[in-house]
């Protein structure tokens, strides 16, 4: 559980850095950036899985594929659901649609909570219920303010929960499954990088892009790998609520990139920030209670050992 929380927080922090990191990838456009993100992430992910001993997961899925060739259909669908989200994540800030994308990440945790409660019968604590209510207020206000839900928002909010749910159904909810998501899109990435637009010429003209692409691969591996592992270790409800840290960081990143929160948008963001604060407080109180229980248990064990020593024959 704690491992999942740490991984989720690490993923959110890394995604916040990545949102800002797009500035270092100019003048690559969103398609070129996406292509190089896929091409640079897979080697880092493979290296990490070799180091952690998870590379066998890739072979495990390959064996399943040989036994049931129809599994390739799921791998293609999984890759599409995953990688189109990664493309949109980069496309948004580059094309001035960062806040629409970030609103999708505001709505996403609510959909995740709904999936957890309905499909997995998971229960919410009082703190989590309060956080959900605040989140509903913020998201509802934003939908009312905009008058509609942008397609970027809807796609983020719906496709990700579907992706994580189906990963559990098809038992690919581990790094091996994510490796296949990236591997399936590599032909598309090569086409976008080399043929759709000659990004090699752009990189040759701007040599700093070589290091920027390497950094993109490392950060993507760190963030996405942590995110995928967190989805495996955490219940759907907790995983969804912890995801609220990400849109908070994305909103700040969007403002750093030049977008601004207007006066009528604050009723969207303040309730979300309060929801995140409640989750942090709940987590902190839970940690304090756990530490107290551990101390009390240690004291009881010490007292018991002392009584046993007193009763033992001298």
Roles of regions detected by a PLM:
Residues 146, 244-314:
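C-terminal-most transmembrane helix of multi-pass membrane proteins
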Residues 102-107, 174-184, 221-255:
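Helix-helix packing/entry segments at the starts of transmembrane helices
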Residues 20-31, 59-62, 91-97, 139-145, ...:
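Membrane-interface helix termini and inter-helical loops of multi-pass transporters
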Residues 9-17, 21, 76-93, 155-166, ...:
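Hydrophobic alpha-helical transmembrane segments of multi-pass membrane transport proteins
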Residues 107-127, 248-267:
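C-terminal transmembrane-helix exit sites in multi-pass transporters
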Residues 25, 33, 37, 92-93, ...:
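Hydrophobic/aromatic residues within transmembrane alpha-helices
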Residues 1-13, 43-77, 126, 178, ...:
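Membrane-interface interhelical linkers
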Residues 1-34, 137-169, 294-314:
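Glycine-/small-residue-enriched transmembrane alpha-helix faces in small-molecule transporters
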């Amino acid at each position: 559980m704690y491992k999942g929380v740490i991984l989720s927080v690490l993923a959110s922090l890394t995604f916040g850095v990545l949102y800002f990191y797009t500035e270092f990838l100019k003048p690559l456009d969103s398609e070129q950036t996406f292509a190089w993100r896929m091409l640079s992430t897979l080697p880092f992910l493979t290296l990490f899985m070799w180091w952690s001993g998870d590379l066998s997961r890739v072979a495990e899925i390959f064996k399943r594929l040989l036994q049931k060739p129809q599994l390739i259909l799921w791998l293609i669908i999984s890759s599409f659901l995953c990688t189109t989200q990664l493309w949109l994540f980069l496309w948004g800030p580059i094309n001035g649609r960062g806040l629409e994308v970030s609103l999708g990440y505001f709505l996403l945790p609510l959909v995740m909570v709904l999936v957890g409660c309905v499909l997995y019968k998971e229960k919410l604590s009082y703190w989590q219920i309060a956080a959900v209510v605040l989140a509903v207020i913020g998201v509802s206000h934003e939908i009312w303010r905009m008058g509609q839900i942008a397609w970027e928002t809807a796609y983020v909010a719906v496709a990700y929960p579907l992706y994580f749910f189906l990963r559990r159904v098809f038992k690919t909810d581990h790094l091996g499954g994510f490796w296949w998501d990236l591997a399936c899109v590599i032909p598309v990435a090569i086409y976008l990088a080399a043929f759709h637009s000659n990004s090699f010429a752009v990189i040759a003209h701007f040599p700093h892009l070589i290091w920027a692409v390497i950094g993109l691969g490392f950060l993507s591996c760190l963030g996405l790998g942590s995110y995928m592992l967190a989805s495996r270790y955490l219940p759907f409800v907790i995983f969804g609520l912890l995801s609220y840290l990400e849109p908070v960081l994305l909103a700040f990143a969007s403002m750093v990139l030049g977008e601004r929160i207007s006066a009528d948008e604050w009723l969207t963001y303040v309730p979300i920030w309060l929801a995140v604060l409640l989750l942090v407080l709940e987590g902190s109180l839970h940690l304090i209670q756990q530490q107290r229980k551990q101390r009390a248990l240690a004291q009881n064990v010490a007292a018991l050992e002392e009584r046993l020593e007193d009763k033992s024959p001298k």
